[in-house]
Amino acid sequence: MSCEMISSRKVDYYVNDPYVLIVDIREREKYLKSRIKDAYNYEYEHLKCDINNIYAYGKVSFEFRQVFGNKDKIYILYCDRGVTSLLMCEKMSALGYKCKTIVGGFEAYKGNCIDN
């Protein structure tokens, strides 16, 4: 599987889809200020550590299992500019997850589904 990069214009199409989870990997403070509607906050450092533990030891954290437990779902990851979310998207895709990332990240998103 590979990580698909989607334009910020396509994000609104996925927001209310029950088979999609949008994951904000920015710091909690930024997430609380503004985010894409219904996005789950899983901070980058935490996600990176959890993914590294899967690769190194085969250990899956409780939170990772709760959030990413369904490999049939599509996971859309985003960060500020799209760089770190692309890295995480590629690692998760290699683990068999259907992942997408937003080109340009949250800064590029100009859609109608923002929670403040």
Task: Please tell me what each predicted stretch does.
Residues V23:
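Active-site flanking residues adjacent to catalytic metal/cofactor-binding acidic residues
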Residues M1-V20, R28-I74, R81-N116:
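Rhodanese-like catalytic fold shared by cysteine-dependent sulfurtransferases
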